[in-house]
A protein has these predicted regions:
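Short, well-structured N-terminal submotif of metal-dependent ribonuclease cores
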Residues: 1-20, 33-40, 100, 112, ...
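Short amphipathic alpha-helical segments and helix-helix/interface helices
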Residues: 5-9, 45, 78-79
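Acidic, PIN/NYN-like endoribonuclease modules and their adjacent C-terminal/linker elements
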Residues: 6, 51, 83-118
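Short, flexible helix/strand-to-coil boundary loops that buttress conserved ligand/catalytic motifs
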Residues: 32, 69, 102
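Extended, non-globular alpha-helical segments
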Residues: 45-51
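Active-site neighborhoods of divalent-metal-dependent phosphate/nucleic-acid chemistry enzymes
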Residues: 53-95
Length: 118
């Protein structure tokens, strides 16, 4: 969680522009609701979508993801969404599943190392 907090702070300092895939708020809601309840889950989603940009998941992205030779379709969708918006990279704790991604992929720690320190 320290890396997530560091990424959030770096985004607040405008060291980078942060995007999440359209599926991310849904996943956050599901996980937080199970742990903390529906009200906290809605607050978490509201904070996420009001603070970060959201990559739209449309038919073009879903089709493009099928052409990416990745095992996990959801991961491929995230890559396709990032590519469609011409983003520079994907940041994920699960870098091993992104070996065939068509865009650079960084772990949170590796991405943080590339950012300014002030």
């Amino acid at each position: 969680m320290e890396e997530a907090a560091a990424l959030w702070l770096a985004h607040e300092k405008q060291f980078f522009v942060a995007y999440v895939a359209g599926i991310t708020p849904i996943n956050v809601c599901y996980i937080v609701r199970k742990i903390k309840g529906a009200d906290v889950a809605r607050e978490a989603v509201d904070l996420l979508i009001s603070t970060l940009h959201v990559c739209v998941i449309d038919q073009q992205v879903l089709q493009a993801a099928l052409a990416i030779p990745m095992t996990d379709y959801e991961d491929a969708v995230q890559v396709a969404a990032a590519v469609k918006l011409q983003l520079d990279a994907v940041v994920t704790r699960n870098t091993k599943d992104y070996a065939n991604a068509t865009i650079p992929v960084f772990s949170p720690a590796d991405f943080l190392k590339q950012l300014p320190t002030t």
